[in-house]
Amino acid sequence: MEPSKLFIMSDNATVAPGPVVNAAGKKTFRTCFRILVLSVQAVTLILVIVTLGELIRMINDQGLSNQLSSITDKIRESAAVIASAVGVMNQVIHGVTVSLPLQIEGNQNQLLSTLATICTNRNQVSNCSTNIPLVNDLRFINGINKFIIEDYATHDFSIGNPLNMPSFIPTATSPNGCTRIPSFSLGKTHWCYTHNVINANCKDHTSSNQYVSMGILVQTASGYPMFKTLKIQYLSDGLNRKSCSIATVPDGCAMYCYVSTQLEANDYAGSSPPTQKLTLLFYNDTITERTISPSGLEGNWATLVPGVGSGIYFENKLIFPAYGGVLPNSTLGVKSAREFFRPVNPYNPCSGPPQELDQRALRSYFPRYFSSRRVQSAFLVCAWNQILVTNCELVVPSNNQTLMGAEGRVLLINNRLLYYQRSTSWWPYELLYEISFTFTNSGQSSVNMSWIPIYSFTPPGSGNCSGKNVCPTVCVSGVYLDPWPLTPYSHQSGINRNFYFTGALLNSSTTRVNPTLYVSALNNLKVLAPYGTQGLFASYTTTTCFQDTGDASVYCVYIMELASNIVGEFQILPVLARLTIT
């Protein structure tokens, strides 16, 4: 090769000049191109993967959305079905609880009115032997055993002057005669009444007879009601019935008494309860009387006494108030040994260590006057469809819910059950409970008591148990003064103060004097209307209210034992007054 075509290097190396340089550039470019292509492919692959992932996610989201949409549609369909079912159920509930009872009541009232017309106009109807049916005037039927006030608003009241009407209660007819212990029951169709007629002053353990009557409410020409007596029975058969309670039942009256010829304190000292009598008196002059031995009586009770106040006919059962002395080692005595109820008046509390007050409250159930037996309240419950075989039981409330046993009354108003208990023990205020029974076909029935806190006034008492005492102690005091609730009681806060009731109290903390008609709220008296002269001696009172639905007038009959200076120690007087509510 020619020398001019070569370069001589210092290290003796030889390199071809032009062609060698072009080959190296091509190789570098090719490498860069390959790297670029690979990078583009890698980026493309990454983009494909990302895009594919996003597509998959979108597809999955769409599927989930479709599923959720499907579920939502199904829920909406179910909700529509449920709403439809709820609507039907609401219609059924309204029909059963509101419409149907109103229709039944309307049909019943129409039937009663029709029967009254038939019996009045057709003298030959065999079922109407007296030509006067045992049915109250239609003006009063819908206003009996109903709450006069249905709301919880604040109201004002006034008690009118006593209305002049013939008394449906006879008095004693001799200076040493005595009529005592009234018991009155007003039902939708008729009323029943009884009292004891004691032959030797007012010593009821000696010899007595029992007066029983039934009748209806009628309207007088003056526009106000009258208690018209249709039947009278005078039980004078040598039995010394005591503390009788009355109840209206279909076509007549039921009466629960006990028979004893010894002092009350001696009954508690014994070990076997006195004879219990259940008497059924019907409008057709039929009388059926049976000696009963309710389940739970023998072996548990030293004595059992009717509550004096009226009983009720409820859900095909007769329910009477009762109380008595429990044997200490009996099943009932052992079960209730540590039970006690200690209410507190927040406006006038009793001071002292709570444990000490609890012990004193427990001891109050065991007064020495009654041989230190636990004095216990109870209810006599008899199945009406088995009344002729006297299938009765004693239902005993817990003493954790009630004070010491005492006389009482069972009320049925607007299908709600209430129980008045006389304040015989240390608690000085009116005692009223809402009650509910659980009846069983087999086994022991039960009752739940819910105390209504009343602090408005106190009945008279004696010694350490005067109306001013608010601390637990052993007492046998007080007097029977049952109230009539005008409104339903509510446990909701803020409206309880508008619970109203009426009755006749004795306006003294220590003496049975000054009978006074009243209307009261829970914590204060709204109206006071004294009856008779200042210092008039009085005793038991029982009150019943009803409404004339023809003109919406409200009437109350206050039956009171009042002192008599002419015939006997007491005269039982029914005082009828009109109650105005604004």
UniProtKB/Swiss-Prot annotation:
Q: Where is this site: Binding to the host receptor?
A: R422
Q: What does this protein do?
A: Attaches the virus to alpha-2,3-linked sialic acid-containing cell receptors and thereby initiating infection. Binding of HN protein to the receptor induces a conformational change that allows the F protein to trigger virion/cell membranes fusion. Binds to the glycan motifs sialyl Lewis (SLe) and GM2 ganglioside (GM2-glycan).
**Which biological process terms from the Gene Ontology are attached to this UniProt entry?**
symbiont entry into host cell; virion attachment to host cell
Which residues carry a glycan?
N284, N329, N400, N448, N507
Q: Which gene encodes it?
A: HN
Q: What GO cellular component term, any one, is given?
A: virion membrane
Q: Which family is it part of? A: Belongs to the paramyxoviruses hemagglutinin-neuraminidase family.
Name of the protein: Hemagglutinin-neuraminidase
Membrane disposition? Single-pass type II membrane protein
Q: Which organism is it from?
A: Mumps virus (strain SBL-1)
Where do the TM regions start and end? 35-55
Q: Which reaction does it catalyse?
A: Hydrolysis of alpha-(2->3)-, alpha-(2->6)-, alpha-(2->8)- glycosidic linkages of terminal sialic acid residues in oligosaccharides, glycoproteins, glycolipids, colominic acid and synthetic substrates
Tell me the InterPro entries matching this sequence.
Hemagglutn-neuramid, Hemagglutn/HN, Sialidase_sf
Q: Where is this region: Involved in neuraminidase activity?
A: 240-245
Any notes on this protein's domains? Answer: The C-terminus (head domain) is involved in binding the cellular receptor.
> Where does it live in the cell?
Virion membrane; Host cell membrane
- Please describe the quaternary structure of this protein: Homotetramer; composed of disulfide-linked homodimers. Interacts with F protein trimer.
Query: So which stretches are on the Intravirion side?
Result: 1-34
Site positions (Binding to the glycan motifs of the host receptor) are R180, K242, E264, Y323, Y369, E407, R512
What's the Enzyme Commission number for this chain?
3.2.1.18
Q: What's the main place this protein lives?
A: virion
Question: Which residue ranges does the entry give as Virion surface-facing topology?
Answer: 56-582
